[in-house]
Amino acid sequence: MTTFSPREIVSELDRYIVGQADAKRAVAIALRNRWRRQQLHGPLREEVAPKNILMIGPTGCGKTEISRRLARLANAPFLKVEATKFTEVGYVGRDVEQIVRDLVEVGIGLKRDEKRRSVQARAEAAAEARILDALVGPTAGQATRDSFRRRLRAGELDDKEVEIELASAAPSGLPMFEIPGVPGAAMGAINLGDMLGKALGGQKGKPRRVTVRDAHAPLMAEESDKLLDQDAIVQEAVREVEDNGIVFLDEVDKICAREGRGGADVSREGVQRDLLPLIEGTTVATKHGPVKTDHILFIASGAFHVSKPSDLLPELQGRLPIRVELAPLTVDDFRRILTETEASLLKQAVALMATEGVAVTFTEDAVDALARVAVEVNSSVENIGARRLQTVLERVLDEISFTAPDRAGESVTIDAAYVRERVESLAQNADLSRFIL
């Protein structure tokens, strides 16, 4: 789990997301509170529950981007899901308890990677020995092995083909079956490979011919797993999920009940009712054992264009006590998005054209013009936030992108006049821009 202070978390988010200081502060404090709880001991630690967050703001203002960056910062089991993917328990579709099962799988993957790093040196030596066996045979003399080992480490044999045999786990693509009417059927799915073992892909794998370069990674993973206690990894991962798991629940506004709508609402209000115990704290049965959700942090977000937060069930509103409102983006925000963020759209466009040998530069007034056009189209057509910049920029670069292979070695300067020539007429014609921008 991360030990960053709230200030450090906010400054890290600032590198990728413009503005939205309140939302950044809220998630930074929530993340730091996870660490603070770990420092407590005794009964008090069990009593400290996470303060779940509801982020409200128009589309394209940074809600989802905050979740993406938070996933990398958290250093804890983190899952981002859309609320619209789920249906009420008892209907065809995924029920919300699948969130916890998926989070456990994420936690196991994180814990396994962490443990693999701790045995990396031993696994490296074992993988190297297996590659040498494939190259020179297990009966080769020590001098021959040493000679090939030197060449292998120097990278001289990377393109040479060898035959290796990997122990294949149960195929992951097998269909999953629900058990209807069985207590704990929420446990969900039984993997046929687990039940029938070797009959459907046991430990014996068939030989494969691959290059030495391609053989290294799977052999390393297999040798690492031989050195690890898989049961201990699962137990630690489940404990980590229960204590530090974070779920980002996107598009929560889409599960608000619509006024005047009758009949069963299996993917709206029914999903809200199913979310209540999950967020409040319950025990979910998974194939790795029961998982308690009492200390999992839930961050919900939604645009609330058609509905409003008060349309959520009152009980669900109460379980999301921290409200954060994200502000719509201004012209200055758009300008900063284009120039200040790491891997900004302009940097990406310049780098992509450079691969064709075309040097593209944007003047200051071109950046201003792009920002202004994006804001104008958002206000006159439909406000889709920062995503509008991608549409406008693609329109501006359309001709250059198409002819770039024939223009290698050229330099192209894009100024405000060029931007206006490409998109101004469309931006001013509201009817036309509805379809093109």
UniProtKB/Swiss-Prot annotation:
GO annotation terms (biological process): protein unfolding; proteolysis involved in protein catabolic process
Location(s), subcellular: Cytoplasm
Alphabetically ordered keywords of this record: ATP-binding, Chaperone, Cytoplasm, Nucleotide-binding, Stress response
Key word Cytoplasm present: yes
Any GO molecular function: peptidase activity
Keyword DNA-binding: no
GO CC list: HslUV protease complex
UniProt: ATP binding residues: V18, G60, C61, G62, K63, T64, E65, D250, E315, R387
SMART domains in alphabetical order: AAA, ClpB_D2-small
HAMAP family linked: HslU
Function in brief: ATPase subunit of a proteasome-like degradation complex; this subunit has chaperone activity. The binding of ATP and its subsequent hydrolysis by HslU are essential for unfolding of protein substrates subsequently hydrolyzed by HslV. HslU recognizes the N-terminal part of its protein substrates and unfolds these before they are guided to HslV for hydrolysis.
Subunit-level organization: A double ring-shaped homohexamer of HslV is capped on each side by a ring-shaped HslU homohexamer. The assembly of the HslU/HslV complex is dependent on binding of ATP.
Family statement: Belongs to the ClpX chaperone family. HslU subfamily.
Full protein name: ATP-dependent protease ATPase subunit HslU
UniProt source species: Methylobacterium sp. (strain 4-46)
